[in-house]
């Protein structure tokens, strides 16, 4: 089950889907999260590492939940 995560600061190392307008645009493992917690870098299962910014309306949906 996927869980939408609004606070990205705890997502490092998690398996996620990045969505935009309800569609999955990327899936992979979060490598890094910015200090402000609004930008993350994901290593997709296919392709090269990409950055996503919450301010651009991207959503993070966790496959593996972040540690609490």
Feature map (PLM): residue ranges:
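Conserved RNA-binding domains used in RNP assembly and mRNA/RNA metabolism
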Residues: 1-68
């Amino acid at each position: 089950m996927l869980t939408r995560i609004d606070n990205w600061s705890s997502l490092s190392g998690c398996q996620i889907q990045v969505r935009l307008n309800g569609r999955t645009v990327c899936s992979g493992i979060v490598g890094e999260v910015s200090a402000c917690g609004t930008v993350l870098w994901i290593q997709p299962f296919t392709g090269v590492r990409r950055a996503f910014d919450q301010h651009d309306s991207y959503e993070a949906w966790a496959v593996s939940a972040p540690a609490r």
